[in-house]
């Protein structure tokens, strides 16, 4: 059984994330969506809220599990004996950062490999930050995030 980990803050999960997860789930026997607990920026949603939105959004993909971690990704990978990291690339600008991350992870855990999946063209502009900004001002986020996530965003920003 080949497992892969797709790490991120998922603050919140977007349809772009879900596209990468669905595609990863077609390639690997199991995809573990891993929510970072100790991200450098303060998240809008708590860890429990992010996990809840992921559970709702990914419930129809049978070979996807959701977990969370605090600390180095490679330590988590070693703990569960997984050697594959999935990362999505929206644009060339993502590549430089992701390439550095992949090399660092490889240095810390030589057995691990990072697999890059290029975003679907319709999601290349999409980011969690952009979605939060639109929702904050009451803009339409239909098609950018699952409906459940949109509800949670509007609730958080008290938008009717």
Swiss-Prot record:
Keyword Nucleotide-binding tagged: yes
Recorded superkingdom: Bacteria
Subunit-structure text: Homohexamer.
Lineage of source species: Bacteria, Pseudomonadati, Dictyoglomota, Dictyoglomia, Dictyoglomales
The protein's Enzyme Commission number: 2.7.7.3
Catalytic activity: (R)-4'-phosphopantetheine + ATP + H(+) = 3'-dephospho-CoA + diphosphate
Originating gene: coaD
CDD domains for this protein: PPAT
Name of one Pfam family that matches: CTP_transf_like
Keyword Nucleotidyltransferase carried by entry: yes
Compartments it resides in: Cytoplasm
Family that this chain belongs to: Belongs to the bacterial CoaD family.
Function statement: Reversibly transfers an adenylyl group from ATP to 4'-phosphopantetheine, yielding dephospho-CoA (dPCoA) and pyrophosphate.
Origin species: Dictyoglomus turgidum (strain DSM 6724 / Z-1310)
Top EC class for this record: transferase
Positions of ATP binding: 9-10, 17, 88-90, 98, 123-129
Family annotation (NCBIfam families): coaD_prev_kdtB (TIGR01510), cyt_tran_rel (TIGR00125)
Full protein name: Phosphopantetheine adenylyltransferase
UniProt-listed GO biological process terms: coenzyme A biosynthetic process
